[in-house]
Amino acid sequence: MKVIIVKIWNKINGITLINDDFLNVDLPNESIDLIVTSPPYNVGIDYNQHDDTIPYEEYLDWTKQWLKKALTLLKKDGRLCLNIPLDKNKGGIKPVYADIVKIALDVGFKYQTTIIWNEQNISRRTAWGSFMSASAPYVIAPVETIVVLYKESWKKLSKGESDITKEEFIEWTNGLWTFPGESKKELDIQHHFR
C-alpha cells in the first residue's frame, strides 16, 4: 500500500483541501475533481520556497511542467480554475494570460471560459510616470483573470443534487466578478497565525 503524504490544510464534508507545492504532491492519476490555483506571477514576490524572479522563458517552462501534472491528476471531467494576471510590466511587458492559456491548450487542456475578476484596486496610478509628459504610459488594469479549463468532458459525468440557489447560479455564471483581493499585508497576517 502506497502512503501519500501531503500538507492537508482542511477537510470539510469529505472534501480535502491541500496546501502544498503542486509539483511535490504525490497523488494518484485521475483522482482530482477540481484544482483552484493562483501560481506565482514571476514578479519578484518573496514566497520563501519559490524563486519568483526567473527569466520569463524559464517561468513558462515551469508553468508547462505543473500544467502537465495537473492534467494527469484530474479526472476525465475534472476542471482547473487558474487565477492569473492579464500581463506583467515588471522586467518588460509580457502577455502572461495569453502565454499560459496557450501552454494549457498545448498540454491537452480544453478551454471553457475566462472570468474577469475586478479587484477594484488601482494602487499604482502613477506607474506610468508624469501625466504632464505621458509619452509612454502603461495601461493599468485593476483586474485579473480566472481561466476555466477542463480535461475531457465539460459536463460532469456523475450526477448529483445541486446545493446552490437560483440566485447564486445566476451570480456565479456571470463572467465579471467584483470583490476586493487580499492585500499582501493581510496574507502575511494570516500566514503568521497558521
Swiss-Prot record:
Belongs to the N(4)/N(6)-methyltransferase family. N(4) subfamily. It catalyses: a 2'-deoxycytidine in DNA + S-adenosyl-L-methionine = an N(4)-methyl-2'-deoxycytidine in DNA + S-adenosyl-L-homocysteine + H(+). It holds the Pfam family N6_N4_Mtase. The keyword S-adenosyl-L-methionine applies. GO terms for molecular function: DNA binding; N-methyltransferase activity; site-specific DNA-methyltransferase (cytosine-N4-specific) activity. This is Type II methyltransferase M.MjaVI. GO terms for biological process: DNA restriction-modification system; methylation. The keyword DNA-binding applies. It comes from Methanocaldococcus jannaschii (strain ATCC 43067 / DSM 2661 / JAL-1 / JCM 10045 / NBRC 100440). The lineage of its organism: Archaea, Methanobacteriati, Methanobacteriota, Methanomada group, Methanococci.
